[in-house]
Amino acid sequence: MAGKLLATSKGYREVRARTKERAKEIIGPRPYHSFMGLLTHSPGRTRVKICGLMSSADVDSAVSAGVDAVGFVFYPPSVRAVSPNIAAQLISRLPAGVDAVGLVVNATDEQFAAIRAAASITLWQFHGDETPERCAQLAAGEPWMKAARVGTGFAFDDFSLQYGHANAFLLDALVEGYGGGGVPFDWQGIPQTWVSENAPRVVLSGGLNVHNVGEAIARLHPCAVDVSSGVEISRGVKDPALMAQFIQAVRAADAKTSSQ
């Protein structure tokens, strides 16, 4: 109750406005880009990102299924990690309108520079403990989104205030490590006021699969959904049939929502 009152109070709006102005002083204005892929907000059409692609077969299957963005993991401990050079080869297979998302976790300046030099990334995904200032510093004016590791009592308002200049917020489950655990979080715990205000740049992740993505879309109406382990036959191994079925489930959910 207190959170809902806070979200609608005049005092909260004033604090939010001051925080945004302070953020501009620290990291500059949030870059606005016209995305053809992942972050094109189009009511009635949920965008789809498939993350952790590692081979040309993965990329070709995702594109054939109608994906809007593919994610490449630049985090060596991950079983889905790829090198910048491999990512560059895979990105060259993408048609116009499909975003190449670069996922990094607490990358050093040198690591980030190597990725940027090799691969044509169109959207950066900061999935570690990066501060807003660090995200803006690394992205250097390029589009970026920040992953939120959502657990019990997660402070949604604080997060969106802190990272208010991100192009998108990616909601993932709080698990050991940094994502890819295939564990959903409690979508009902997301405050409706927060959803209403931020839905045009919310990317929902965390344990999505062909069986639950329809419910997730019906509840939250996110701009996009993000899947990785939910379309795998074993850890790190994507399945073309599951990728196609996942996107079909998203389109079915969109059609159902539009008809209501």
Where are these regions (language model features)?
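Extreme N-terminal basic, low-complexity initiation segments
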Residues: 1-11
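N-terminal hydrophobic alpha-helix used for membrane targeting or insertion
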Residues: 9-14, 175
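Short polybasic linear motifs
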Residues: 19, 23
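Residue-level detector of alpha-helical hydrophobic segments embedded in or interacting with membranes
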Residues: 24-26, 217
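Conserved N-terminal beta1-alpha1 strand-loop-helix module at the mouth
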Residues: 32-259
